[in-house]
A protein has these predicted regions:
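Conserved MFS/SLC helix-loop-helix module at the cytosolic interface between two early adjacent transmembrane helices
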Residues: 62-100
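12-transmembrane solute porter fold
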Residues: 10-26, 31-33, 42, 46-47, ...
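C-terminal membrane-cytosol helix-exit motif in multi-pass small-molecule transporters
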Residues: 134, 173-196, 381-389
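Paired small-residue
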Residues: 90-93, 101-110, 299-307
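Helix-loop-helix hairpin linking two adjacent transmembrane segments in secondary transporters
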Residues: 141-184, 195
Length: 399
């Protein structure tokens, strides 16, 4: 077997892209932990609180396709920096918000910035890697998101417990500045000409459609689970924000741990078998706790966190590789935006459905049906979608 050499510049771009993706992931999990304190401070219940997440993700989605076009036209570096500037302005407005409507408006501004930056993060991360090595690169990229899911809940819990929910928004500013510095230092300043055909052109490609569907389902399950678990632990189990943050952090540990190994396995075996196993594992974990009397907190809930993390982790790399390898590299910005849009639509739907599931309360009688619904989605939707993935023709892998 011929060894494919990856240039050093590719690894530098991977670091910058992964760091930017991690920042956007930290934002979602950090804010989720702070939501119960937001509710107490601004006198808002669990159902309207879900709009803090939902509005962010919806505006994020709206600006993803323009962001993808900018990446293909101007390059990842310029687009990432523009997105980070808008995102930081939204974080500052959120930290200073004096009412719930103002907080929602600030989250919309953050979503606009994230929508511009997200396609640059993924396209930039793999820009120097040949198709046959993208699984390994995306495994690392996925692991960075897993690490972000560890940092986000713990940082959010620590800051909220010590200083209140506003501290979580203030913390995003230095993190965004660090990400901008990495982008300037590590991502090449390249001009890229947009090739004919918009995002809709690539929707005709089977793996792009299937990968987008699988990516959306992954985030629906992940964000929905995080929201439900956080509300249950803080409102019913009596956990502090910091202690409650350990649950999504444990899930994130296993998401991150699964990433690099899954990436290498995907390069060797393809996306389909890994995606099938991933949805099966995640569905089994959710069904175990949704359909039985298994404890939802304490050490008895550890198997749920492990199974959910190991199930969702490989899907970060698998869905991205399947879609990116189905199109030429000059279209990576637009296809990255489609993937991100699917993920964010899934996340928004997950947060919204979770808020509806808990409208009668955040106790076990409401949490278990929500987990069961997540399991059903993994099995009934996830497995068929994964089964339809196929290796892309060689011509589509050209860069």
């Amino acid at each position: 077997m011929t060894t494919v050499v990856v240039p050093r510049s590719a690894w530098r771009s991977l670091i910058a892209g992964s760091g930017l993706a991690a920042l956007l992931q930290i934002d979602g999990t950090l804010v989720t932990v702070a939501l119960p304190d937001v509710g107490r401070s601004l006198t808002v219940g669990p159902q309207p609180l879900a709009w803090v997440i939902t509005v962010y993700f919806l505006t994020y989605v709206v600006f993803l396709l323009p962001g993808g076009r900018l990446v293909d036209r101007l390059g990842s570096r310029r687009t990432a920096l523009a997105g980070l500037a808008v995102f930081s302005a939204g974080a500052l407005a959120g930290a200073l918000a004096s009412s719930f409507p103002l907080l929602i408006a600030s989250r919309a501004l953050q979503g606009i910035g994230a929508g511009l930056a997200s396609p640059a993060a993924l396209a930039g991360a793999v820009s120097g890697f040949p198709p046959e090595r993208r699984g390994s690169a995306l495994g690392i990229w996925g692991a960075s998101s897993g690490a972000a899911n560890i940092v986000g809940p713990l940082l959010g819990g620590l800051l909220t417990s010590a200083f209140g929910w506003r501290a979580a928004w203030w913390a995003l500013l230095p993190l965004a500045a660090a990400s901008a510095a990495a982008v300037i230092r590590l991502l090449p300043a390249t001009e890229r000409a947009t090739a004919p055909g918009g995002a809709g052109t690539f929707l005709r490609r089977r793996n792009v459609v299937l990968a987008a569907a699988a990516a959306g389902l992954t985030f629906l399950v992940m964000i929905g689970s995080f929201f439900v678990i956080e509300q249950y632990l803080q409102r019913s189990a009596g956990y502090s924000p910091l202690l409650a943050a350990t649950a999504p952090a444990v899930i994130a540990v296993f998401i991150g741990a699964a990433g690099p190994t899954a990436g290498r396995l995907i390069d060797a075996r393809g996306e389909r078998p890994v995606a099938l196993m991933s949805f099966l594992i995640a569905g089994a974990g959710l069904a175990l706790y949704g359909l039985t009397g298994a404890p939802l907190h304490g050490f008895g809930a550890l198997p749920l966190a492990i199974l959910l993390g190991l199930g969702l982790g490989p899907l970060f790399a698998g869905t991205s590789r399947a879609a990116l390898n189905a199109v030429p590299q000059h279209a990576h910005g637009r296809v990255s935006s489609l993937l991100s849009a699917s993920r964010l639509l899934g996340a928004a739907l997950g947060a919204g459905l979770s808020g509806l599931a808990l409208r009668g309360g955040a106790d076990a009688t409401h949490v278990r049906p929500a987990l069961t619904f997540g399991a059903a989605l993994c099995i009934v939707v996830g497995l068929p979608v994964a089964a339809l993935l196929r290796p892309p023709p060689a011509a589509q892998e050209q860069i």
